[in-house]
Amino acid sequence: AQALCDYTAQGGTVVVTYWTGVVDESDLCYLGDTPYGLTDLLGLRREEIDALYDGETCHCAATDDGAMEADGSILCEVAALNDTDPATPLMLYAEDYYAGCPAVAVHAFGKGQAYYLASRFNADFYNDFYAQVCEKAGLQPAWPEQLPAGVLATRRGDFVFMQNCNDHSVDIDGVELEKYSTRLVQLEPVDEDDES
């Protein structure tokens, strides 16, 4: 927990999801405020965890500070904002007894930002959310175009590893990537002397 706090204070961006800081490495529940060791970093504390039935969802609405809305599933964590130095809610639960509680929040900590996701959302939400977080953090995608679902791109220097995790082949910019395969793509190096 301290390493995450130090990283964020120095300008890093951290995303914390539901179930974070509930138990230790021996699977014993922490006593006291949770997420354990992260309440100051996140600007909130978890008060309760509500498990949802299969197929049940809880709608979450955007706040004035957030532009997204989504339905949470699996569970809904109920968190209260810290009295001093609270997080800024980006989405609030819109129904049930936790209506008005933060479902997604951001907290400025030192030179960085810490995000808290209190429920499980769908893939479209995560795509939009992480695109916004990466843009704010100044991160560039490993591949310039939107990739099909199930395809991962990881950049290492002038190389991009394209991984197809699908049970079917996909076409990426005219190159077929077979099912369950990896392809190495070499990018053209940028000559910094030629930039003006």
Report the location of each language-model feature:
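A conserved amphipathic helix/loop scaffold
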Residues: A1-S196
